[in-house]
UniProtKB/Swiss-Prot annotation:
Basic and acidic residues composition bias: residue spans: 1-11
PROSITE patterns, sorted: RIBOSOMAL_L33 (PS00582)
Organism taxonomic ancestry: Bacteria, Pseudomonadati, Pseudomonadota, Betaproteobacteria, Burkholderiales
Region (Disordered): 1-32
Organism: Polynucleobacter necessarius subsp. necessarius (strain STIR1)
MF terms (GO), sorted A to Z: structural constituent of ribosome
PANTHER family reported for this sequence: 54S RIBOSOMAL PROTEIN L39, MITOCHONDRIAL (PTHR15238), LARGE RIBOSOMAL SUBUNIT PROTEIN BL33M (PTHR15238:SF1)
Protein name as it appears in the record: Large ribosomal subunit protein bL33
Similarity comment: family membership: Belongs to the bacterial ribosomal protein bL33 family.
Gene: rpmG
Amino acid sequence: MAKGSREKIKLESSASTGHFYTTSKNKRTKPEKMEIMKFDPTIRKHVAYKETKLK
């Protein structure tokens, strides 16, 4: 079977609340680090989430 090109990543809140989302992305088409605005339920606001390694 072929190896998948998608890798699991963790999106961690830049507001230092400890909240994170997990998702996957295609490393071949998007090699740069992902940064996206998402809702942080801890502070109840939209903040930037930055990609980190999923342990």
